[in-house]
Amino acid sequence: MYQKSIVVVGLTLYFVAITGCGTSLTDSTVTGVVTIDGGPAPEGVTVMFQPVKAGGSPSYGKTDSQGRYELQYNASAKGANSGDNVVSFGVEYMEDEEGVPFLPEPLKGVKIPAELQENSSLRKNVEPGRNEIDLEISTAN
């Protein structure tokens, strides 16, 4: 699970880097709430939307302490590509002084099912304009 989360975070950083800087890549915005087993996701869960259509730019967001997120292409451009998107989730590990990875306190115990990480089967449609897309993660087997 740790390696998959690292891969997901690595892919996020890669996609952010290749999209570059800009002001607006689309007229679509996406906000919402992520819940895990019915309760709000803790601060720091990464949400990624990858357009199914070739050539689309991925978007990402991080949950706040109430589970809310807002998608952005990079630090200066908010938004998401309209159309069908693959949605995936991840958590970002930090490193201590010795380089040992650990999860920050709010993310300890967070379980993201493998099918919602890399190669996720979850899809959501983004309409032009403002979108409110709430996302539910269930950890039940």
Enumerate the predicted regions with their spans.
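Beta-strand-dominated extracellular/periplasmic modules and repeats
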Residues: 21-141
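Sec-dependent bacterial lipoprotein signal peptides
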Residues: 1-19
